[in-house]
Amino acid sequence: MELRLFVGLGNPGLQYTQTRHNAGFLAVDALAKRWQCSWVEKSRFKGYLAEGAGPGGRAILLKPTTYMNHSGQSVRAVADYFRLPPQQLLVLYDEVALPLGKIRLRPEGSAAGHNGIKSLIEHLGTNQFARLRIGIGREPPPPVLTNYVLGKFAPEEQEQLPAILDGCVEAVEAVLAKGLEKAMSIYNARSFGSPPDP
């Protein structure tokens, strides 16, 4: 089976731990735990790399340390080194347009205002790569977006996270085992975690 690269987007540093914008980091951390592989910092790739075996073959996990807006530098370096075309890439990242508990697999698409994805498109020269968008919701009334995404998950949201991250792992493993289209039909309609009581 072909080698696959799974990239989680986020910002490095303790101050960004458990923030909504780091949902991608949290998701690939969950994958690393599931596949029992360890993170190693690789300066040549400007990120943390973990290599393991998922369903269907060998997989590489990546957490860029370039900060969100320059994630494409790290992804391009890894893709070039391992000679991976965009079709063997899946990017996991936060999505304010989806409520907490929802995830969406897509085969391709625009950046839709996400600076991390914008950087990937610029450095890879294409938007033809799969992605898993992880819903982080949006406070009503809409706040300043930057403050919201860089804020930490609220305590009641933290309670939902384990189930949401389990859903991300299941969806990625379904992509590997059954293909993207089948995984989309299963997971794009599901919700994970119980919303807090009103």
Swiss-Prot record:
TRNA binds at Y16, Y67, N69, N115. One of its GO terms (biological process) is rescue of stalled ribosome. The keyword Membrane does not apply. It catalyses: an N-acyl-L-alpha-aminoacyl-tRNA + H2O = an N-acyl-L-amino acid + a tRNA + H(+). It is an enzyme of class 3 (hydrolase). The record marks D94 as: Stabilizes the basic form of H active site to accept a proton. Gene3D superfamilies: Peptidyl-tRNA hydrolase. Its main location: cytoplasm. It comes from the Bacteria. It is found in: Cytoplasm. Keywords: Cytoplasm, Hydrolase, RNA-binding, tRNA-binding. Its EC number is 3.1.1.29. Belongs to the PTH family. HAMAP family: Pept_tRNA_hydro_bact. This is Peptidyl-tRNA hydrolase. It comes from Gloeobacter violaceus (strain ATCC 29082 / PCC 7421). The lineage of its organism: Bacteria, Bacillati, Cyanobacteriota, Cyanophyceae, Gloeobacterales. The gene is pth.
